[in-house]
């Protein structure tokens, strides 16, 4: 297929047109008075959202060169969302502002490579300044404030996330689901939960809730399949003498072994249940070891020279309560020693620090969360499906922003921190490198200007007033139209969100500015399909 090749200024101008169209669509969602964007769906009702990355994902332009420009900035939004969970609109607005200003200078004769070098240097300096002016999140109130801002000033969402984080801890798992009612709910699962349910419904003890409940149970952990009952008999006889319930967690239990366990349960000989071990391969072995440490038990492993026949009461773990439904097993208050659990947590944290695989890191973080805290489930309620999806987007954003704030600290919000950090940087650059640095410093005003503009205020006046004021916490509250102490007003942003948004925006804008040619496919206009001939006369004898 023939290709269309465009060079230098023509190429960059066409790319800019695409970036501008994307930015104009996304920027209206910014700030407490940001507007909604209505998105047509291929089926069902249209979606309505104020989530920048959701809007960006839907933008596809007809012109192929423009679409390439938009696609690169979409990548900024997606990458920022992946890394920080929020700040997608900020990243898009920054990327557009840097590209626009840079394009003007390069068209006037500046060297793109020197300009890029200056942009990279000032970006590193501003990031260092942001970290310097940040402060750690100290209490529940600040967590609620971060979540509220990210959820478009919805205080109920902020409180919900703060409550969830208070209950499960900073490393705990918090998930977001759709509620069955119009009310928001927070359910906390204390202890450890993994995604394996009972192997047979005959193990159920609570028919109304369709779940197994074991009080003060013992826990047998085995890393292979159990098919032969003979191997299990010695430990089962010992458990029966204690009169306590037993949970068996193994790779699988099948055939004669499972059938005999079910019969013993139904006859009341032994209160017993069985589930498959979570995970696969080496990860399964690691998770079994996690459960052993949590419950104070030992994994029976043939690799360590242990057989199932050799298992004794001393090898079994203990817990206050275990709940099992068809999908999940929850261990409440395991009897493991706190020092052992802490050592295991530290070991997993060390593995997270050295792994280079995103997938491995995610799985290690799941294990860390299961060991170090419970699981909080936020159920989002709304009157309609459209409202539900929009609200769930905001809760996801707020949750990600809150985790980012806990991780790296907070700065004043509303775009003011970027301006203050930019003003504090003193660079000694010359020539086109200085032009690159100045481009970024001017672009740092763009988020605040956009927030003010969306709220109906004079963007230039507001941005200038914030810039010239020397108070570190001075900023503009667009919700009420006043200049305030941003920390006292609770208008704060995670420093990670600001940092990632700026770094990604500078990265993609500098790529666009150093582009000298574009190669794209030439779209061929296909002839329209011929009309079907008239069948005439309708369907004759049909009534």
Curated annotation (Swiss-Prot):
<dbReference type="GO" id="GO:0051082">
    <property type="term" value="F:unfolded protein binding"/>
</dbReference>
<dbReference type="GO" id="GO:0005737">
    <property type="term" value="C:cytoplasm"/>
</dbReference>
<dbReference type="GO" id="GO:0042026">
    <property type="term" value="P:protein refolding"/>
</dbReference>
<feature type="binding site">
    <location>
        <begin position="29"/>
        <end position="32"/>
    </location>
    <ligand>
        <name>ATP</name>
    </ligand>
</feature>
<comment type="function">
    <text>Together with its co-chaperonin GroES, plays an essential role in assisting protein folding. The GroEL-GroES system forms a nano-cage that allows encapsulation of the non-native substrate proteins and provides a physical environment optimized to promote and accelerate protein folding.</text>
</comment>
<dbReference type="InterPro" id="IPR027410">
    <property type="entry name" value="TCP-1-like_intermed_sf"/>
</dbReference>
<feature type="binding site">
    <location>
        <position position="493"/>
    </location>
    <ligand>
        <name>ATP</name>
    </ligand>
</feature>
<dbReference type="GO" id="GO:0005524">
    <property type="term" value="F:ATP binding"/>
</dbReference>
<dbReference type="Pfam" id="PF00118">
    <property type="entry name" value="Cpn60_TCP1"/>
</dbReference>
<comment type="subunit">
    <text>Forms a cylinder of 14 subunits composed of two heptameric rings stacked back-to-back. Interacts with the co-chaperonin GroES.</text>
</comment>
<dbReference type="GO" id="GO:0140662">
    <property type="term" value="F:ATP-dependent protein folding chaperone"/>
</dbReference>
<feature type="binding site">
    <location>
        <begin position="477"/>
        <end position="479"/>
    </location>
    <ligand>
        <name>ATP</name>
    </ligand>
</feature>
<dbReference type="InterPro" id="IPR027409">
    <property type="entry name" value="GroEL-like_apical_dom_sf"/>
</dbReference>
<keyword id="KW-0143">Chaperone</keyword>
<dbReference type="InterPro" id="IPR001844">
    <property type="entry name" value="Cpn60/GroEL"/>
</dbReference>
<keyword id="KW-0547">Nucleotide-binding</keyword>
<feature type="binding site">
    <location>
        <begin position="86"/>
        <end position="90"/>
    </location>
    <ligand>
        <name>ATP</name>
    </ligand>
</feature>
<dbReference type="InterPro" id="IPR018370">
    <property type="entry name" value="Chaperonin_Cpn60_CS"/>
</dbReference>
<comment type="similarity">
    <text>Belongs to the chaperonin (HSP60) family.</text>
</comment>
<protein>
    <recommendedName>
        <fullName>Chaperonin GroEL</fullName>
        <ecNumber>5.6.1.7</ecNumber>
    </recommendedName>
</protein>
<keyword id="KW-0067">ATP-binding</keyword>
<dbReference type="GO" id="GO:0016853">
    <property type="term" value="F:isomerase activity"/>
</dbReference>
<feature type="binding site">
    <location>
        <position position="414"/>
    </location>
    <ligand>
        <name>ATP</name>
    </ligand>
</feature>
<dbReference type="InterPro" id="IPR002423">
    <property type="entry name" value="Cpn60/GroEL/TCP-1"/>
</dbReference>
<keyword id="KW-0963">Cytoplasm</keyword>
<keyword id="KW-0413">Isomerase</keyword>
<dbReference type="InterPro" id="IPR027413">
    <property type="entry name" value="GROEL-like_equatorial_sf"/>
</dbReference>
<feature type="binding site">
    <location>
        <position position="50"/>
    </location>
    <ligand>
        <name>ATP</name>
    </ligand>
</feature>
